């Protein structure tokens, strides 16, 4: 009985803390809304495209064969750009 009561009170406390934290983030405008574009991920995508093509161009200028830079995290370098696999 005591264990069940402790578990219920712990869950209630966690729920209250989680809800309070979510309300604070929402008030600060840091929570994403459904359908809202993820600008940070878009910026990462642009960085990956730029990073791969610049790396390849630098290697070409050095009179070397262009070795495409490896893209990590589910990305592949193709035509001097990192593309999602």
Swiss-Prot record:
Q: Which cysteine pairs are covalently linked by disulfides here? A: 52-66, 56-77, 71-82
Q: Give the signal peptide, or none.
A: 1-22
Q: What does the function comment of this entry state? A: Neurotoxin active on both insects and mammals.
Q: What is the designated name of this protein?
A: U4-theraphotoxin-Hhn1a
**Family of the protein in this entry:** Belongs to the neurotoxin 12 (Hwtx-2) family. 02 (Hwtx-2) subfamily.
Coiled-coil parts of chain: none
Q: Which PROSITE patterns match?
A: HWTX_2 (PS60022)
Tell me where in or outside the cell this protein is found.
Secreted
Q: Name the predominant localization.
A: secreted
Instruction: Give expression by tissue.
Output: Expressed by the venom gland.
InterPro entries (alphabetical) = Hwtx-2-like
Which residues are the propeptide, according to the record?
A: 23-48
Print the keywords alphabetically: Disulfide bond, Neurotoxin, Postsynaptic neurotoxin, Secreted, Signal, Toxin
One GO cellular-component annotation of the UniProt record comes to:
host cell postsynaptic membrane
Task: State the species of origin.
Answer: Cyriopagopus hainanus
Question: Which domain of life does the UniProt lineage start with?
Answer: Eukaryota
Tell me, how does this one assemble?
Answer: Monomer.
The terms under GO molecular function for this entry are: toxin activity
